[in-house]
């Protein structure tokens, strides 16, 4: 009788735990959507933000947010039991209003590379497949560790890199950003790592004074020629391209950006047989 009771109680607890998981999740940022899928929450998502295009299944979901704002009325009509948000990218007032309706909000605001596996583990507590979240977090950590070890061994700190966003105006990133941290991970030096703001606007003259030895841009290789033309004749250095979505979104695919950048920087490092 006792054994039967314990079995019944165990089953009840398991059912209660499963029932407590959110069933109707809304993501308000592309990187949050990617994080949710990586954490095994894809089947729990009911709506996403604009530009949530990865994985491909995300494009089939209703969009309730964009750069223009959050569709508060539609979100409330969908009756979510969890919202994944982004402090820097989502307007705060509608988020406060959603919180007033007692809708739980999880903020995914990675500031460092280590924050990404931490966020995946946080999402594991809401996922029907927590083991998938843990596996994604572990894989990310291990590969970042490998790249860090390789970068330290390259002795490439003398390779000065300019991370370029746009041309007119011209923006870059400081060490406070994930993009700059990737450059450091690869053993190189971001020439504007010391900027007091994360995304400084810089002038052509400021870049030239700091004498970069390579430029990193987000986009496809067909952009290289226009970037080289922009800097000629004062600056003629290699231009490295990286998939823009990988590089700009603070999600699991940032690891792919790191692999791509580290590989290309290694080829340019002093002592490399590929260095020119």
Curated annotation (Swiss-Prot):
Transport as UniProt keyword: yes
Q: Coiled coil where?
A: none
| Record-linked InterPro entries | ABC_transptr_periplasmic_BD, ABC_transptr_vit_B12-bd, Vit_B12_bind_prot, Vitamin_B12-ABC_binding
Site features described as Important for BtuC binding, chain residue numbers: 73, 205
Question: What's a single GO CC term here?
Answer: periplasmic space
Q: Which GO terms describe its molecular function?
A: cobalamin binding
UniProt record, GO biological process:
cobalamin transport
UniProtKB keywords: Disulfide bond, Periplasm, Signal, Transport
Segment forming the signal sequence: 1-20
* Bridged cysteine pairs (disulfide): 186-262
Q: Which residues form the Fe/B12 periplasmic-binding domain?
A: 24-273
> Which compartment or compartments is the protein found in?
Periplasm
Question: What is known about what this protein does?
Answer: Part of the ABC transporter complex BtuCDF involved in vitamin B12 import. Binds vitamin B12 and delivers it to the periplasmic surface of BtuC.
By sequence similarity, the record places it as follows: Belongs to the BtuF family.
Q: How does it assemble?
A: The complex is composed of two ATP-binding proteins (BtuD), two transmembrane proteins (BtuC) and a solute-binding protein (BtuF).
Q: Check the record and name the HAMAP family matching this protein.
A: BtuF
List the PANTHER family hit by this protein, alphabetically: VITAMIN B12-BINDING PROTEIN
Protein name from the UniProt record = Vitamin B12-binding protein
Biological source species: Pectobacterium carotovorum subsp. carotovorum (strain PC1)
Organism phylogeny: Bacteria, Pseudomonadati, Pseudomonadota, Gammaproteobacteria, Enterobacterales
């Amino acid at each position: 009788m006792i054994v039967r009771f314990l079995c019944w109680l165990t089953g009840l607890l398991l059912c209660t735990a499963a029932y407590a998981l959110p069933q109707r999740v809304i993501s308000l940022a592309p990187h949050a959507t990617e994080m949710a899928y990586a954490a095994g929450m894809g089947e729990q998502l009911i709506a996403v933000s604009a530009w949530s295009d990865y994985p491909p299944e995300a494009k089939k979901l209703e969009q309730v947010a964009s750069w223009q704002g959050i569709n508060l009325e539609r979100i409330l009509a969908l009756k979510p039991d969890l919202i994944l948000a982004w402090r820097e990218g989502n307007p705060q007032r509608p988020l406060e209003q959603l919180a007033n309706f007692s809708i739980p909000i999880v903020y995914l605001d990675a500031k460092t590379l280590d924050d990404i596996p931490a966020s995946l583990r946080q999402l594991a507590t809401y996922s029907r497949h927590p083991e998938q979240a843990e596996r994604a977090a572990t894989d990310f950590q291990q590969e970042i560790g490998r790249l860090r070890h390789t970068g330290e061994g390259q002795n490439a700190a003398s390779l000065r890199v300019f991370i370029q966003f746009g041309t007119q105006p011209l923006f870059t990133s400081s060490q406070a950003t994930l993009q700059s941290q990737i450059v450091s991970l690869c053993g190189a030096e971001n020439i504007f790592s010391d900027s007091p703001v994360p995304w400084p606007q810089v002038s052509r003259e400021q870049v030239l004074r700091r004498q970069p030895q390579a430029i990193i841009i987000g986009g496809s290789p067909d952009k290289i020629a226009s970037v080289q033309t922009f800097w000629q004749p004062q600056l003629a250095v290699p231009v490295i391209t990286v998939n823009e979505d990988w590089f700009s979104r603070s999600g699991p695919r940032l690891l792919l950006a790191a692999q791509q950048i580290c590989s290309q920087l290694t080829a340019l490092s002093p002592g490399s047989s590929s260095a020119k």
